[in-house]
């Protein structure tokens, strides 16, 4: 089995401390911190952090915690607050102006009103190092598990001051893009390049960075990038997601991965919609049986599927502890709704999000972990 590394990109919103609405202030942030890099995104109220390459979940937890604390401190110094949430609960990160760059201006000119409300935030997990052919193999095996991964970080139930009825409204907003959603089965590098060339020729994408599939070969680094998830409410939930994604890639690239499980594109898209709508506390579509099952059943099946790889990397105890914590506390969407039910005030929901975003100084990865075997 390959020695798979991890990296995580987290997108955040900058909020005005008075109105708790998105604030167009990303251009004021420095490009690097001690823990990783910081990038500007499409909406000027967004920033994105990127960890260094990590080999263990403990290292990843440490880097993510440090990045969040550094960005929150930087935001506070400039009069803003940092929120890890899929969509802005109050106000909107759009409509334009978009971030002032030639690429983003061209996107606005080309796609028009699709740009509106695209100040949404996700958590992107990179697993590497993989060449293109290997990343495609891993992505094909991972497709059926995308609805389960989406469940883990549903974190966008409120938008423009009201409950959307979805656990992940970000998923719905993001699906407006022509090349967003579950990826197609891609059988070779030649097939991949053919699909990309067709999308470019049609104008559906301007470049390979606009392949907004839920899993894709990264266009910048030699990884498989899984981008199905909302911005994780907490560092723990981001680490849980990353551990399970690496587990899936590890199974796909093992000596006996089994054949790619065939899943019809329409069924997979419906299953992802179902996960985004009902969330972790509801019911989701099992793409194997075509039946609705309690969402936690999908997650439990996922953990059992990747258990050998989790054991190999020493991640099983940590993943089990993180899942137990999530099961006890509920998903981020549920936690936000409980705050609103108690206070009947969307501002209290945002305050809750802000508290969850920044980890305590003494935060550590739950669960006992051992070093990977040789």
Curated annotation (Swiss-Prot):
GO biological process, one term: modified amino acid biosynthetic process
The keyword Transport appears for this protein: no
EC number(s) recorded for this UniProt protein: 6.3.2.2
InterPro entries hit by this protein: GCL_type2/YbdK_subfam, GCS2, Gln_synth/guanido_kin_cat_dom, YbdK
Cleaved signal peptide residues: none
Sorted UniProt keywords: ATP-binding, Ligase, Nucleotide-binding
SUPFAM superfamilies hit by this protein: Glutamine synthetase/guanido kinase
The keyword Mitochondrion belongs to this UniProt entry's keyword annotation: no
A Pfam family this chain is assigned to: GCS2
GO molecular function: ATP binding; glutamate-cysteine ligase activity
Catalytic function, reaction form: L-cysteine + L-glutamate + ATP = gamma-L-glutamyl-L-cysteine + ADP + phosphate + H(+)
Broad EC category: ligase
Biological role: ATP-dependent carboxylate-amine ligase which exhibits weak glutamate--cysteine ligase activity.
HAMAP family on file: Glu_cys_ligase_2
Similarity field: Belongs to the glutamate--cysteine ligase type 2 family. YbdK subfamily.
Protein name: Putative glutamate--cysteine ligase 2-1
Organism expressing this protein natively: Saccharopolyspora erythraea (strain ATCC 11635 / DSM 40517 / JCM 4748 / NBRC 13426 / NCIMB 8594 / NRRL 2338)
Source lineage: Bacteria, Bacillati, Actinomycetota, Actinomycetes, Pseudonocardiales
């Amino acid at each position: 089995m390959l020695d798979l590394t991890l990296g995580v990109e987290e997108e955040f919103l900058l909020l005005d401390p008075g109105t708790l609405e998105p604030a167009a202030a990303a251009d004021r942030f420095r490009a690097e911190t001690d823990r990783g890099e910081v990038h500007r995104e499409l909406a000027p109220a967004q920033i994105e952090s990127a960890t260094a390459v990590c080999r263990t979940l403990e290292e990843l937890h440490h880097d993510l915690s440090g990045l969040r604390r550094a960005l929150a401190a930087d935001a506070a110094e400039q009069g803003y607050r940092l929120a890890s949430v899929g969509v802005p609960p109050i106000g909107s990160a759009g409509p334009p102006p978009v971030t002032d760059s030639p690429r983003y201006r061209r996107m606005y000119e080309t796609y028009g009103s699709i740009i509106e409300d695209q100040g949404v935030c996700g958590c992107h997990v990179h697993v590497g190092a993989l060449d293109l052919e290997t990343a495609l193999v891993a992505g094909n095996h991972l497709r059926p598990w995308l609805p389960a991964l989406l469940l883990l970080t549903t974190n966008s139930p409120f938008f423009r001051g009201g409950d959307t009825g979805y656990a992940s409204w970000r998923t719905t907003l993001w699906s407006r893009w022509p090349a967003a959603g579950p990826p197609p089965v891609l059988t070779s590098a030649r097939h991949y390049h053919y699909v990309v060339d067709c999308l470019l020729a049609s104008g559906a994408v301007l470049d390979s960075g606009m392949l907004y599939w839920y899993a894709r070969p990264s266009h910048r680094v030699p990884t498989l990038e899984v981008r199905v998830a909302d911005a994780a409410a907490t560092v723990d939930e981001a680490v849980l997601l990353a551990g399970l994604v690496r587990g899936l890639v590890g199974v796909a690239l093992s000596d006996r991965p089994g054949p790619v499980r065939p899943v019809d594109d329409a069924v997979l898209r419906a299953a992802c919609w179902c996960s985004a709508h009902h969330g972790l506390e509801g019911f989701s579509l099992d793409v194997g049986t075509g039946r609705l099952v309690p969402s936690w059943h999908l997650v439990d099946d996922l953990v059992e599927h990747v258990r050998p790889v989790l054991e190999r990397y020493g991640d099983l105890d940590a993943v089990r502890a993180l899942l137990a914590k999530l099961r006890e506390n509920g998903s981020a969407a549920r936690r936000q709704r409980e705050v609103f039910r108690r206070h009947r005030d969307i501002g209290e929901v945002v305050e809750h999000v802000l508290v969850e975003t920044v980890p305590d100084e003494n935060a550590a990865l739950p669960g006992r972990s051992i070093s990977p075997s040789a």
